[in-house]
Amino acid sequence: MEKPEFYFSHVGINEGSPKETEEMVKFCRLLFGAGDIQESAHAYFAGDRTMEIQKGGGRGRNGHVAFYTPDLKAAMAYLEECGYELDASSAKYEEDGTMRLIYLKDEINGFAVHLTTRK
């Protein structure tokens, strides 16, 4: 099977406590500028969205690493062929029903790993 395209998307940092999250966001504002911090219901994003600071924890002992792929089905098949099991229960879908995200079943070096179709 031909290897599909994979690109680094972002690293997710799990919240230790609300105070620690606040300190990380403050530090990122210092480095990247206040305008580069976006907030969502579950996380803050910094560094051109390459850093995700989770609110209330997240997957992975140390956090997570995300990889963008333009062809999620091919990427999933490729990883499964290479011996990596996917966690079907972790799949997230767009409103039109197409899958946009899925995690590997097992962590790698303490990090959860997910594939995403969003840059």
Task: Give the location of each predicted region.
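Core segments of cupin and vicinal oxygen chelate
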Residues: 1-51, 74-81, 89-100
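Eukaryotic phosphotyrosine signaling hubs
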Residues: 8, 60-64
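Short hydrophobic/aromatic beta-strand micro-patches
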Residues: 14, 66-70
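Conserved donor-binding loop and adjoining core beta-sheet/short helix segment
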Residues: 55
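Short, charged/polar surface micro-motifs in flexible loops or helix N-caps
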Residues: 58-59, 72-74
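Short beta->alpha transition motifs characteristic of CBS
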Residues: 115-119
